[in-house]
Amino acid sequence: MTNFKFSLLACSIAFALNASTAYAAQPTNQPTNQPTNQPTNQPTNQPTNQPTNQPTNQDSNLSEQLEQINVSGSTENSDSKTPPKIAETVKTAKTLEREQANNIKDIVKYETGVTVVEAGRFGQSGFAIRGVDENRVAINIDGLRQAETLSSQGFKELFEGYGNFNNTRNGAEIETLKEVNITKGANSIKSGSGSLGGSVIYKTKDARDYLLNKDYYVSYKKGYATENNQSFNTLTLAGRYKKFDVLVVTTSRNGHELENYGYKNYNDKIQGKRREKADPYKIEQDSTLLKLSFNPTENHRFTLAADLYEHRSRGQDLSYTLKYLKTLPDLPEVDSRHTNDKTKRHNISFSYENFSQTPFWDTLKITFSKQKIKTRARTDEYCDAGVRYCEGTANPAGLKLKNGEITRRDGTPLQFKEINNTTTPNSNSNKDKTYDFSKLIDTNGKEIESGITRSNDTFWYDCSIFDCENPGKMKVAEGKTYYRYDGTWKNNVQLEKKVLNGKEFARINNGTRGKTFPILPSSLGYLERLWQERDLDTNTQQLNLDLTKDFKTWRVEHNLQYGSSYNTTMKRMVNRAGYDATDVQWWAKRTLGTRFDFLKNEEIVETCATTFGWNAFLCPRVDPEFSYLLPIKTKEKSVYLFDNVVITDYLSFDLGYRYDNIHYQPKYKHGVTPKLPDDIVKELFIPLKSGQNNNDAEVKKNVQENIDYIAKQNKKYKAHSYSFVSTIDPTSFLRLQLKYSKGFRAPTSDEMYFTFKHPDFTILPNTHLKPEIAKTKEIAFTLHHDDWGFISTSLFKTNYRDFIDLVYKGEREFEVGNPNNRGKISFDTFQNINRDSAVVKGIEINSKVFLGKMAKFMDGFNLSYKYTYQKGRMDGNIPMNAIQPKTMVYGLGYDHPSQKFGFNFYTTHVASKNPEDTYDIYAKDKNQTNTSIKWRSKSYTILDLIGYVQPIKNLTIRAGVYNLTNRKYITWDSARSIRSFGTSNVIDQKTGQGINRFYAPGRNYKMSVQFEF
């Protein structure tokens, strides 16, 4: 009978490895009698929650176990033989190191059914799981919810389409993570609001992970990746002295943009939507994790922690197009968009842990956290003088200032074309020679356009740049007639010196207006720069109380976890904009000069407030701060209860319940809070009186009334979440798991209140939105054996109710300006609504077999297979774009028994995205009968080979070759990030030019070296 079990398992795995219609679930490294829905921010009875000076009952492999990172539903760790838990994946730190994960995208590289949302220049923005993405997939770090995007689809389409906001979910530094837990399907027990499609929960490392058998640990790792030329350095220090222990993990990363396929073959000078080469960015990331703990006794532990993370990206959006502002869209670009984006997260926390067993708890943990997250998008638009001709700094003659004197480009005296002179050309014997000052004799003897100024304005020489003590160095011409270039050199130049605004200047004092002109380039001498800086701030203070208790009732074992949480979050937007100058040249005006005041009968110094002209260099402008959204304060209270009930060795249940109370409070103080543009709130709720549309006083009053009205609209939501999981083991090799869970997401303030008016794209507010609800049903069958491995097949279905989505509402007329002048204009309108229903269903397979049982020479080898197929529809038959195409991952791995070396070979196959499974929300607006998305991903297969070697005890070398066959492909997440309108992430929709920018890298390599002591 035993042999039959082994044969049945082996045959089942072999079938899964070859089946194209297989169904995958995710494995886990958790013991089977542990709760599957355990809140990740809660303490458990694991050794990592024990004081470092306490003995443990773990075996000799505990050190290795504690350095593992768990991702619910996965068993990438090559030595893991534990069968998977339903709908969860567990990935270890050892696995992330083995796979050389550098970012969140690498974490799920070999997972099926989980992908990362692409956000163009801003990188990644959260995850996509089971048909939903971004804010509908919860992300926590050490129990703290991470920054959410402004989830109103109208806001995203409107502003992200133009690259104005860094509206993304922040990432995490891989090197600081101890555990990553990915749950598929609705489950708000762990994360509260937002866990509709699933959750991704990170836990950071702790000194106790390294100090089990010694009092210190030192590690240094250096790595490099060719896909983006990223190099990184990580230093890890852990130590214990008496009752104190400390951990420091610091990481720095430096690289550039991800190199798309054919990166080196494309023209890097092309600007606009037809650009095929990835936009250039310099990307840096710094992270520091610091934890200091004090254990006064063996049952008490205090910890002060700081988790500091900063991601910076500087470069140019060369694919960005400004042509929407041009009359002739085919004109070449002049200005280019320079970016300086930042994501910054600071979390300071203090925790107290108690391990004294009482009637109410076995472990108790109280944590206070203060987290600040800032996502910033900074853009500067100006002409790139180093790349193209720029009118503002044009100097065609190459005039140069040398030792206070104006010369030719090589420092030699100026020479101009002579006109009808009888003397020797350029001879000094006749100072009255006539020249054409528009023609300069270049250093090679050829005539070129001088491009000198013929301005009527008085030029003030800055004496700190020009030699005001030697007027002869001021090259000045005297025209024969007014406003022409033919003339003579002006002799005996006299200068009038004046101190203007604390600096000494000089001007020509003996010239003739209209005839006398300085030899200077005619351009402004600087580049005008329009800049915008837009911040999204999320500041959270949170208090957690988490307890665990193990007990028995009769013969039934209970592993009880319960607790509560209270937090306040302030989310606000701050926009800054201005106008100034960059690349200032030596001939640029350094003063506005003077003008004669006839009332005062005297000459006065010009200022930015009094001048009639405009000078971006001397009079830069900074606009008042403004915002498109009211700041919102959110108060959240929650209590939870979770019990893992073990009835017998063959039957156990996981029961979870959570109650959430969410209160939104708009906060606005007139004159203090960044102002909302009038057009956004005018007549939003309170209409203007008839005929007052052009009355400025009435409009201002109406704006304030509408803001006050919004600020008083507090919103409250209550939610009850639950989860039920049953695990049945009828035999030693067969397991049946059933899951039913509920999750929710409360509408965000921007989804309810955001409005925007434009004839092409108008967003209407909707204050009647209901919370989104998700209910997941899942069943999993698992064949497993301690020596052979496992195969797990699951079927799932998630029903979404009141799914919030942006829909086209048709045309609507708005009164604009004076009705007698412009009348009414039709606006294309969109609005967030609660859809009646949405459903996602699918099948997953997850299997792993260890080959050592088949033959001795195959000891250490393993085969794995994962497969996910899912399909989803909204409102009956509208496809859900976040659903991934059918995906399967084959794996072959090997680990030497002594762990001296090993490798993994992965084959990933992704099917094409079918047109009937996509939906263009702008199809109606474009009067299209075909509602599918035009640009989709085709099927592809990629091969990766990664390995490690440990030549000596303290040294580990890892290397990998990715996309081994150099396959050209585009992922569905990249393809769906292409926008049909806007100026960012756009291509030529007619020809497809520019789409190569979105393709994944070709063959690339990674390598790292790590020393440990």
UniProtKB/Swiss-Prot annotation:
GO terms for molecular function: siderophore uptake transmembrane transporter activity. A motif (TonB box) lies at residues 67-74. Residues 213-1013 form the TBDR beta-barrel domain. Residues 78-205 form the TBDR plug domain. It is found in: Cell outer membrane. Keywords: Cell outer membrane, Membrane, Receptor, Repeat, Signal, TonB box, Transmembrane, Transmembrane beta strand, Transport. Pfam families: Plug, PT, TonB_dep_Rec_b-barrel. A motif (TonB C-terminal box) lies at residues 996-1013. Acts as a receptor for hemoglobin of the human host and is required for heme uptake. This is Hemoglobin-binding protein A. It comes from Haemophilus influenzae.
